[in-house]
Amino acid sequence: MPRAVRATIIQPDPQVPVDRFGPWLASNRVLVRAVPLWQRDVPDVDSLGDGLLVLGGTMSAHDGADHPWIEPLKELMVAAVDAEIPTLAICLGHQLLAEAFGGKVTVNHPGGGEHGATPVSWHAGASDDPLLGRLAESGRSLLAQSHNDVVTKLPPGVDSLATSDHYANQAFRIGSAVGVQFHPEASPELMGRWAELSGGDGRTMRRAMHVHDTEVSRNGRLVAQAFCGQLHTRSMAA
């Protein structure tokens, strides 16, 4: 009998939950262990299971003085890549992954943030990526975004897989890890809550996201399904 497929979810911020990824992972027979970093320490790489999912947060990648888990989390992602553990890093996770390998993040980028349903264009090589390939086949995808900080320099030797009209580094791969600036997990309700937390109009955001949710949800589910597929492959090979 095959063993259970397990993944670890790192949650830096109570305001940034796993949201729709929770039921999507469950429907793909992946058991999860959640690690809320305001309550627990960054885990050891040997305890991650078959995969690692790093969520976003309202803090920045440079807030290590207030959030001492930031450096250990970066070290964990490096260790996960060294161990060839499938890793998906979202928003803040994407930014921490970039800096962990020598990239650069600009906090509160003067060009402004991206919020709401945002078109992302895929570079040619993205269609071959084992995690993002199905999503990239369309050439352009509508995805949920909520960020003001930006990866302005990728790690040495790493190429961008996707760009938006405003920022060039929407997704990248380094070894077994993929970072995405967008939020494949975010529902219209969560996007509205984030808008309210930042002083915006949550009702307007929810309405706008509901208009596009058929496409946005489909695209997010493609990412979740591909991630789960990688976890099952790793589990069977173990």
Please annotate each region the language model reported.
Residues 101-188:
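Pocket-forming structural segment of enzyme catalytic cores
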Residues 186-238:
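Acyltransferase
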Residues 10-13, 54-58, 148, 182:
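Glycine-rich His-Gly loop
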Residues 80-104:
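Catalytic nucleophile loop
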Residues 23-88:
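Flexible gly/pro-rich beta->alpha loop and the following alpha-helix that scaffold active-site loops
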Residues 5, 50, 141:
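Nucleotide donor/acceptor-binding cores
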Residues 5-25, 38:
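N-terminal beta1-alpha1 ligand-phosphate binding loop
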Residues 25, 91, 227:
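Residue-level signal for inorganic ion chemistry
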